[in-house]
A protein has these predicted regions:
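Catalytic histidine-centered segment of alpha/beta-hydrolase-like enzymes
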Residues: 275-286
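Conserved alpha/beta-hydrolase "acid-adjacent" motif
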Residues: 248-254
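Conserved acidic catalytic loop of the alpha/beta-hydrolase fold
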Residues: 90-110
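Alpha/beta-hydrolase
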Residues: 148, 152-240
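Glycine-rich "HGGG/HGxG" loop immediately N-terminal to the catalytic nucleophile
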Residues: 64-85, 277
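Conserved hydrolase catalytic core segment
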Residues: 109-148
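Short, surface-exposed "cap/lid" segments of acyl-processing enzymes
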Residues: 25-63
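N-terminal cap/lid segment of alpha/beta-hydrolase-fold proteins
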Residues: 1-22
Length: 301
């Protein structure tokens, strides 16, 4: 399916935006903390991506890269700055720019949003601030508020370096030892090379690694220390929480905390069998795709 890719310019960093056009409801994917749209919603296994699935169902599929990721502009590497780049308020402002473009271009007054992991924090903040722009909200592996002190160190960093080996270890750590692998591409051979390709400097590091903003780590630490940057009570759209059976980031308790506080009466929690926090890259992706598209297709109450 034909995909348009362009850089959205304006007030702020240039943002890479993807679109697979259809006349239906626009659906925007909001990626997580470590890899951009090309490696998530737009990545094709056996010739098919999640964006392709949305498009085939009649949805106008959109995605973008936050500043500091993929094809978008990088934050300034100012060693003198104490600000941690890539925090949720900055990310929510970038979502606002993308949604404004979608609304202007398509004529739809509101869109559906599917966000993953740390991206749910930025998406939740945006949806709380702009309820008129969000028709439906899907929180895939969301970060919930906890009341356990989580430290990120005495001197928070501005950047992280992430290797393919670290990504793979993270992807498989929640799978029970007695269970076969669940990744569609077990060794991440092609995915890993594509991941390193999202950072022009990655190959020059030893070991090769992708540089990403540290903001998401700080946001998650705050959330798990009792300070989520958005209030679920402020959400005014039907909301789906979707997570894997083996998701170590979004626990049953986390899902229950969010579900009990969401502000719209239509709120659901779907747990996908044999899936982890990264199930869009796993064999369980079909269950994820089905749960999300069925929710997106429902008539607004």
């Amino acid at each position: 399916m034909k995909q348009q890719v362009f850089i959205l310019q304006g007030d702020g960093p240039g943002l890479l935006v993807r679109r697979q056009q259809s006349a239906g409801l626009p659906v925007l994917y909001v990626h997580g903390a470590t890899f951009p749209s090309a490696l998530s919603v737009a990545y094709r296994f056996n010739g098919r991506s999640w964006m392709d699935d949305w498009n085939a169902r009649g949805f106008d599929a959109w995605a973008f890269d936050f500043a500091g990721y993929g094809g978008s502009d990088r934050y300034s590497d100012d060693a003198q700055s104490e600000a941690i780049p890539g925090r949720a308020p900055q990310a929510a402002a970038q979502i606002a720019r993308v949604v404004a473009h979608i609304v202007s271009l398509t004529g739809h007054s509101a869109i559906a949003m599917v966000a993953h992991s740390w991206g749910t924090m930025a998406a939740g903040l945006y949806a709380a601030l702009h309820p008129e722009r969000v028709a439906r909200l899907c929180l895939f592996g969301p970060i919930a508020q906890r009341d356990e002190r989580t430290e990120i160190g005495p001197s928070p960093q501005r950047w992280r370096l992430v290797t393919v080996a670290q990504q793979r270890a993270r992807f498989i750590e929640d799978v029970p030892q007695e269970h076969p692998h669940v990744l569609i591409e077990p060794d991440l051979g092609m995915w890993g090379q594509a991941y390193l390709g999202t950072d022009s400097e990655a190959a020059h590091r030893d070991p090769p690694a992708v540089k990403i903003p540290y903001g998401p780590v700080a946001d998650i630490a705050d959330a798990w220390s009792g300070s989520l940057p958005w209030r679920p009570q402020d959400i005014r759209a039907p909301t789906l929480i979707v997570r894997g059976e083996w998701d170590g980031v979004t626990t049953d308790r986390d899902a229950a905390w969010l579900l009990s506080r969401l502000g719209h009466p239509v709120r659901r929690d779907a747990k996908i069998s044999k899936g982890t926090h990264l199930m869009h890259l796993e064999h369980s992706c079909e269950g994820l795709f089905q749960a999300v598209r069925e929710f997106l297709k429902e008539e607004r109450p």
